[in-house]
Amino acid sequence: MGRGKVEVKRIENKITRQVTFSKRKSGLLKKAYELSVLCDAEVSLIIFSTGGKLYEFSNVGVGRTIERYYRCKDNLLDNDTLEDTQGLRQEVTKLKCKYESLLRTHRNLVGEDLEGMSIKELQTLERQLEGALSATRKQKTQVMMEQMEELRRKERELGDINNKLKLETEDHDFKGFQDLLLNPVLTAGCSTDFSLQSTHQNYISDCNLGYFLQIGFQQHYEQGEGSSVTKSNARSDAETNFVQ
């Protein structure tokens, strides 16, 4: 009958914990020795107890094993660093080639370095330029249409604002006129002013009429007086002739 599964957790009882440590330590050292003998492996084991006591096992020496460990670790780090460096160099080379290709393409698009290009390359470049020109014109047309639509929208908004202000102004003027008609003080003042203006105008008209009548009478009087003088002169002439 096998033993039950032991739960792996810290043993709280100090004595029990010390006994378990002693038994497990001996078993672990035995296993390390067996592994080194059976498999011809370099094995080193270092154990520190709770009290700080050192226990060790090594078939070749703990110091030698530690030195070998550091050498292997440094080599691994160097290998990893070398691989990383080589990978970075390859990436830089790829990016440099891509940059040079893009720079050469840009020069070709602006009409530079065309001497060494073949007919096929020139035809390809021509198609690219035509496509770029078509796309540019299309985008330009779209931007202009959007700007025109925006201007129309602003024009409509300004027209609405203008109509609204016009209606508000007309309504304000109409209300002011209504208030003027409904206010008795203002109405009386307006009537008085109107009466004064009418009287003044009538007075001016009467003066003009009187002046006209006076002028007519004076002319008539002068004409009548002239006739009397003429008649008197004629009478005097007649009397003189009679005496003669």
UniProtKB/Swiss-Prot annotation:
Chain's role: Probable transcription factor.
Pfam families registered for this protein in UniProt: K-box, SRF-TF
MADS-box domain: residues covered: 3-57
Name of this chain's protein: Agamous-like MADS-box protein AGL13
Record-linked Gene3D superfamilies: Transcription factor, MADS-box (3.40.1810.10)
Any one of the GO BP annotations: pollen development
CDD domains: MADS_MEF2_like
Domain of life according to the entry: Eukaryota
Keyword Transcription attributed: yes
SMART domains to which the protein is assigned, alphabetical: MADS
Gene Ontology CC annotation, any one: nucleus
The keyword Cell inner membrane appears for this protein: no
Main localization of the protein described in the UniProt heading: nucleus
Keyword annotations: DNA-binding, Nucleus, Transcription, Transcription regulation
Stored PROSITE patterns: K_BOX, MADS_BOX_1, MADS_BOX_2
Domain K-box: 85-175
SUPFAM superfamilies registered for this protein in UniProt: SRF-like
Gene Ontology molecular functions: DNA-binding transcription factor activity; protein dimerization activity; RNA polymerase II transcription regulatory region sequence-specific DNA binding
Lineage, highest ranks first: Eukaryota, Viridiplantae, Streptophyta, Embryophyta, Tracheophyta
Compartment list: Nucleus
Organism: Arabidopsis thaliana
